[in-house]
Regions:
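Bacterial N-terminal signal peptides
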Residues: 4-15
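His/Asp/Glu-enriched, well-ordered alpha-helical/loop segment
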Residues: 27, 32, 101-102, 108-114, ...
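Divalent metal-coordination and catalytic microenvironments
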Residues: 41, 56, 61, 82, ...
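C-terminal cap of metal-dependent C-N hydrolases
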Residues: 41-44, 400, 412-456
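Polyanionic/metal-chelating signatures
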Residues: 133, 138-303, 432, 438, ...
């Protein structure tokens, strides 16, 4: 019995990161929903298909079928003739909640700019669920979003993926079982922030040295815990009786010291945490991919990447997504060499993973229009980009980037019923989200104020003006 208790302690102690990942668990519960069939719509499924004059049926929070089929007799029926239906829109780069509205110093909680390596901080611990930006984004069809720390540091901390539902806590918004991300930054930001303080890094080579030193420490941390587990397992297998129990207990009393920073970095090296890297220049992105090869981890997504078009083939070959702006560049030197065809060119190679992101509390409200701009510029350059492909830039590719493509981002059977009904083609400047569903529950209606959530912070502040 004593020995079993010791081994239970071992199981708890030796799983690096498990304690962290189980901390602050998601309490998200889908809202009540009803079986719903949407009739006669133009449907963009998110996986490359377009269905005209088609139907969509979901029940118990999941897509049941798309195209045609049988629905329950008690189903709610929505006639969407002349309208378009897409998966819920996903923004992979948002700071809602960590830089909430109103924009005052007291709300500046996105950058722990006190050291170049702050992998120990978690963005969710700064999220203010009352940020009015969440409901504004919902009105634009945003059903899921990743909240990231800022880009002042080499390692900025963990990101979190949220369901865009009204809630009093971030835990109640937390996307169930979505993997954590790690925000990293290359280029001007870290070297500017710390170079001004006359400390490292102050150059790009200092940036890279800082990453590599941290990865070495993380690998040593993994090795220390693995060696600890090996010794305990060996002790348990070879020793018996009171003397063996004493030796086992002594070994258990000497675990490596727990380190929150290194737990996060170790999570990346073990493949449990996805790297999201702020990076603009093509040469730097290639350097980062080489470094990932050196330490045996995968870069998930480069964010911003205004020069990603220069290395589109390499990104595709390495399985790296590019989360990009449609037409935002030139605001600093490393952002100088941007082109409006960037997204379309990153999307072009086989295996290319282009994403339209916002990094803006305003842009997130019109992410469909940002995708439309990128599609238009690609078409003008002679590329064939139908709507059914471009919609993936803000749905299925975004879900892939966040590690939730098996749960949301497409309208196929068994996926979460995250759905938007648009008044017309979502790539039109006149498009508006009429109705939004998350896990099959209607959470927004353009024509019903009862389904237009507002933040608790705004209650009592909105004044109706008589016509």
């Amino acid at each position: 019995m004593f020995r079993k208790a010791l081994m239970a302690s071992l199981a708890f102690c030796t799983q690096i990161g498990v304690a962290s990942d189980n901390a602050f668990p998601s309490t998200y519960q889908p809202l009540a929903s009803e079986p719903t069939v949407i009739r006669n719509a133009t449907i963009l499924t998110g996986d490359g298909k377009r269905l005209d004059n088609a139907d969509l049926y979901f029940d118990e929070g999941r897509i049941v079928w798309v195209g045609s089929g049988e629905a329950a007799d008690n189903s709610r029926v929505i006639d969407a003739e002349g309208r378009w239906v897409t998966p819920g829109i996903i923004d992979v780069h948002s700071h809602l909640g960590v830089y909430p509205s109103p924009d005052v110093d007291a709300h500046s909680d996105g950058n722990e700019a006190t050291a170049p390596v702050t992998a120990e901080v978690w963005a969710e611990h700064s999220v203010w669920p009352q940020d009015p930006g969440f409901s504004r984004a919902l009105a634009g069809g945003i059903t899921s979003l990743q909240i990231l720390p800022g880009s002042a540091n080499l390692f900025g901390g963990r990101s979190v993926t949220l369901k865009n539902v009204p809630a009093g806590t971030y835990q109640a918004m937390k996307f169930p079982s979505a993997p954590y991300g790690l925000k990293m930054a290359c280029g001007e930001n870290p070297k500017r922030v710390y170079g001004r303080r006359k400390t490292a890094p102050s150059t790009r080579m200092g940036n890279v040295a800082g990453y590599r030193s941290s990865w070495i420490k993380a690998q040593r941390y993994i090795d220390d815990w693995s060696e600890y587990e090996r010794k305990i397992t060996e002790q348990e297998a070879t020793d018996t009786g009171a003397e063996g129990n004493a030796a086992l207990a002594a070994a258990l009393n000497k675990p490596p010291k727990r380190d929150l920073e290194l737990e996060t970095l170790a999570g990346v090296l073990k493949g449990d945490i996805i790297v999201h890297m702020h990076c603009y220049r093509a040469d730097e992105m290639v350097t980062i991919m080489d470094m990932a090869d050196e330490f045996g981890y995968q870069v998930g997504t480069f964010h911003h990447g205004v020069e990603a078009y220069k290395i589109a083939d390499q990104l595709a070959q390495n399985g790296v997504c590019g989360a990009l702006w449609a037409d935002w560049w030139g605001f600093k030197m490393e952002a100088y060499d941007g082109i409006q065809e960037n997204i379309a060119l990153v999307d072009r190679p086989e295996g290319g993973c282009a994403i339209v992101h916002s990094d803006s509390d305003e842009g997130i409200q019109r992410l469909n229009q940002e995708a439309a701009k990128a599609m238009a510029r690609g078409r003008a350059a002679g590329l064939t980009i139908p709507e059914e492909r471009a919609i993936g830039w803000i749905t299925s590719n975004a879900a892939k980037s966040l590690g939730v493509a098996d749960k949301t981002g497409t309208l196929v059977p068994h996926m979460m019923a995250d759905v938007v009904i648009w008044n017309q083609n979502p790539f039109s400047v006149y498009a508006k989200a009429d109705q939004v569903f998350i896990d099959g529950a209607q959470v927004y209606d353009r024509f019903d104020v009862r389904l237009q959530p507002i933040s608790d912070f705004e209650l009592g502040q909105l004044i109706e003006v008589a016509p």
